[in-house]
């Protein structure tokens, strides 16, 4: 959503399966570009950060909203230089009927992330946080050696 909340977003985006809010049904907010696009003026304010990747100088972090999944429904793996996050739950009833959900996310790890020090946690409000420290560029992240002056 780099262009802001006023630009139409794809219907099948990260909010798929979330249900509609009242402002989604107002004609003022409907898009005239295509039936597969819609404007969601306030959703980015209400639900920002659904999937956020940060690569700071010292740390690499992925934050992913998985509130519809229990810990048993989630799988987090490192395969080669990628983090793979998979979630799936069977059909269950919610406010709008019956729904089943499944997602698969794959993120490339920066080369300088120390894979042996990666942590992953799930908060009570359903936010999955995956993070790992970065090693200085003159060090190999797979080794714990460092030059001593």
Swiss-Prot record:
Keywords: Cytoplasm, Eye lens protein, Metal-binding, Nucleus, Zinc
Pfam families documented for this protein: Crystallin (PF00525), HSP20 (PF00011)
Subcellular localization, as worded in the UniProt entry: Cytoplasm; Nucleus
A GO-annotated cellular component: cytoplasm
Domain sHSP: 41-149
Binding site residues for Zn(2+) 1: 89, 91
Domain of life: Eukaryota
Binding positions (Zn(2+) 2): 96
Keyword Cytoplasm in record: yes
CDD domains: ACD_alphaA-crystallin_HspB4 (cd06497)
GO molecular function terms listed in the Swiss-Prot or TrEMBL record: metal ion binding; structural constituent of eye lens; unfolded protein binding
One annotated GO biological process: protein refolding
Positions with a binding annotation for Zn(2+) 3: 143
Function comment: Contributes to the transparency and refractive index of the lens. May act as a chaperone, preventing aggregation of various proteins under a wide range of stress conditions.
Similarity comment text for this entry: Belongs to the small heat shock protein (HSP20) family.
Subunit structure as annotated in this protein's UniProt entry: Heteropolymer composed of three CRYAA and one CRYAB subunits. Inter-subunit bridging via zinc ions enhances stability, which is crucial as there is no protein turn over in the lens. Can also form homodimers and homotetramers (dimers of dimers) which serve as the building blocks of homooligomers. Within homooligomers, the zinc-binding motif is created from residues of 3 different molecules. His-89 and Glu-91 from one molecule are ligands of the zinc ion, and His-96 and His-143 residues from additional molecules complete the site with tetrahedral coordination geometry.
The protein's name: Alpha-crystallin A chain
Native source organism of the sequence: Anas platyrhynchos (Mallard)
Lineage: Eukaryota, Metazoa, Chordata, Craniata, Vertebrata
């Amino acid at each position: 959503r780099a262009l802001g909340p006023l630009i139409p977003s794809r219907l099948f985006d990260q909010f798929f399966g979330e249900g509609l809010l009242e402002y989604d049904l107002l004609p003022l907010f409907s898009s005239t570009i295509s039936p597969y696009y819609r404007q969601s003026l306030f959703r980015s304010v209400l639900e920002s950060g659904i999937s956020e990747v940060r690569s700071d100088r010292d740390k690499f972090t992925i934050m992913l909203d998985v509130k519809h999944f229990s810990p048993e429904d989630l799988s987090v793996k490192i395969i080669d230089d990628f983090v793979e996050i998979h979630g799936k739950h069977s059909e269950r009833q919610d406010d709008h009927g019956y729904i089943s959900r499944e997602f698969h996310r794959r993120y490339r790890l920066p080369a300088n992330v120390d894979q042996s020090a990666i942590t992953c946690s799930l908060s009570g409000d359903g936010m999955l946080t995956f993070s790992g420290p970065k090693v200085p560029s003159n060090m190999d992240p797979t080794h714990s050696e460092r030059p001593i002056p």
